[in-house]
């Protein structure tokens, strides 16, 4: 997709401007460092994302945003264009992995997109608590509008779910805060911006590894087979010593924003 000219935010928001990697390829390394900084190591080893990341950065450089405050990256957005069915009940259980593969295959087949799928929004540590998560989400919607796309679809990773790994996602998403809004801060952002929570994608990312790899990724020991809670995982991981295999299956939540012209 073609890129757009960076712009300056209104005075009511923290002063920032937006640049795509198409416009600022020199930001690639810092953009990727910022994007990876918020994740536990194991989240960087989804084989579908790893296999397609280079193509996505090449094909969709105009859809990778850096929100800049001066010469510092305050937040990064990674998203991909793709064709989706307007019957959102058909959004698949495989979430992120589906969107990554479909965006690449749609592009290579010349299929015209009607939606953007957000892969991640990461706010740099220095700028957390300054409303950049909401600002970045608005930029995603604005980006879709500029390119005349109908929808923004997101397999959302709820911010606080990792604190409750034994609670099923189906229960967690219905928790409310005292104001009657979603308990989870990230789901609240989308709710306030008009997003519709559609369904759970139970197998959004599937991350396999050997027991040794899981030890390296988490810094934990796994002396027996079974289910283990690891920091920042939304569900327990499964360890099978006999097969020398660890497996993490990440659930996310499909949220859709309808883009108005």
Where are these regions (language model features)?
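Conserved acetyl-CoA-binding loop of GNAT-fold acetyltransferases
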Residues: 191-199
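Short amphipathic alpha-helix that is part of the acyltransferase structural core
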Residues: 2-94
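Conserved acetyl-CoA-binding loop-helix of GNAT-fold acetyltransferases
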Residues: 120-123, 128-146, 151-154
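A short catalytic or substrate-binding loop motif that flags glycine-/basic-rich loops and adjacent residues
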Residues: 57-60, 245-250
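Short alpha-helix
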Residues: 184-192
């Amino acid at each position: 997709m073609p890129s757009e000219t960076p712009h300056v935010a209104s005075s009511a928001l923290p002063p920032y401007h937006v640049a795509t990697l198409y416009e600022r390829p020199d930001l690639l390394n810092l953009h990727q460092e910022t994007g990876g900084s918020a994740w536990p190591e194991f989240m960087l080893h989804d084989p579908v994302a790893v296999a397609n990341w280079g193509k996505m950065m090449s094909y969709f450089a105009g859809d990778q945003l850096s929100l800049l405050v001066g010469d510092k990256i305050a937040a990064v957005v990674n998203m991909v264009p793709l064709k989706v069915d307007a019957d959102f009940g058909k959004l698949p259980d495989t979430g992120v992995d589906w969107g990554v593969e479909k965006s690449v295959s749609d592009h290579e087949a010349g299929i015209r997109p009607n939606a953007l799928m957000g892969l991640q929004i990461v706010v740099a540590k220095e700028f957390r608590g300054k409303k950049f998560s909401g600002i970045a989400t608005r930029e995603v919607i604005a980006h879709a509008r500029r390119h005349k796309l109908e929808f923004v679809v997101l397999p959302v990773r709820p911010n606080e779910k990792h604190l409750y790994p034994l609670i099923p996602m189906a229960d967690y998403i219905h928790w409310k805060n005292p104001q009657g809004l979603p308990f989870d801060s990230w789901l609240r952002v989308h709710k306030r911006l008009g997003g519709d929570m559609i369904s759970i994608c139970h197998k959004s990312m599937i991350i396999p590894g050997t027991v040794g790899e899981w030890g390296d990724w988490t810094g934990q020991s796994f002396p027996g087979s079974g289910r283990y809670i690891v920091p920042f995982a939304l569900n327990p991981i499964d360890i099978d010593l006999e097969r020398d295999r660890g497996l993490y299956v990440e659930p996310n939540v499909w949220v859709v924003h309808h883009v108005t012209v």
